[in-house]
Amino acid sequence: MADPVIPVVLFAYARPAHLARALACLRENGVPLIYAFADGAKGAADAVAVAETRALLRAVDWCEVRLTERTENWGLGKNVLAGVTAVAAEHEAFVVWEDDLIAVPGTYAWVGAALRHYAADERVMSVSAWTHPRVT
């Protein structure tokens, strides 16, 4: 894999509290580049939360952020497809991250190492992670 930087492709919508936790996690993991796709509000009721979400993305000062702010609500499926397609045109590998995802320190490094390790293996199309839901 020739691409030394593996960006995170982050999808966000009107959930600023979720996004704040996700961004803290990405910061702790040392992510160098984020492509953020912020969907537009579904209606007036979501406009404030969408604005707060976008403000959090604009305030990131610890890595490069390439922010796309949708003027209309595209919906999750269309927004993800368009975002992944755009980033795939520029990078061989990337990590998809939603605004409600948090992970332990080292997750980004582990995923990056796995992507680099399997880059030439035609049997491997993607790397993913999952954990059993914690019940408290």
PLM region spans:
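N-proximal low-complexity "stem/linker" segments adjacent to membrane-targeting elements
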Residues: 1-28
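Structural beta-sheet core signal
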Residues: 8-10, 36, 96, 126
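Acidic donor-binding segment of Leloir-type glycosyltransferases
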Residues: 25-68
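Short acidic/polar active-site loop segments enriched in Thr and Asp
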Residues: 32, 92, 125
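A short, glycine-/small-residue-rich helix N-cap motif at loop->alpha-helix starts
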Residues: 71-79
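Active-site nucleotide-sugar/metal-binding loop of Leloir-type enzymes
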Residues: 81-93
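Short beta-strand-to-loop acidic/aromatic patch adjacent to the donor-nucleotide binding site
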Residues: 91-102
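Conserved donor NDP-sugar-binding/catalytic core segment of glycosyltransferases
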Residues: 106-136
